[in-house]
Amino acid sequence: MQKIRKGDSVVVLSGKDKGRKGEVLKVMPKDEQALVRGINVVKRHQRQTQTQEAGIISKEAPIHLSNLAIADPKDGKPTRVGFRVEDGKKVRVAKRSGALIDG
């Protein structure tokens, strides 16, 4: 089970976006990276295609999972993730407050 999943609210721990919060759009476990909405935005030069015109577009670049932490459901501050079994299911738990992260 992954500690950070698609749809999670995360806080950036280091880099140019340190302290900012965002929602995980995609997780790439093989590369140990994630795409986060509004975080690590870079400008890319787009070549013209039949459907898209040329220009400079802004898009999110992947950020390493070690630079992200789950936002605590209670206070929004960064927390580590633990696991616990409840009703026969393995669930993620915020170490900071003990609150369930999913369901």
UniProtKB/Swiss-Prot annotation:
Keywords: Ribonucleoprotein, Ribosomal protein, RNA-binding, rRNA-binding. Gene3D superfamilies: 2.30.30.30. It comes from the Bacteria. GO terms for cellular component: ribonucleoprotein complex; ribosome. GO terms for biological process: translation. The keyword DNA-binding does not apply. One of its GO terms (molecular function) is rRNA binding. PANTHER family: MITOCHONDRIAL RIBOSOMAL PROTEIN L24. Belongs to the universal ribosomal protein uL24 family. Part of the 50S ribosomal subunit. One of two assembly initiator proteins, it binds directly to the 5'-end of the 23S rRNA, where it nucleates assembly of the 50S subunit. One of the proteins that surrounds the polypeptide exit tunnel on the outside of the subunit. This is Large ribosomal subunit protein uL24. It comes from Brucella anthropi (strain ATCC 49188 / DSM 6882 / CCUG 24695 / JCM 21032 / LMG 3331 / NBRC 15819 / NCTC 12168 / Alc 37) (Ochrobactrum anthropi). The gene is rplX.
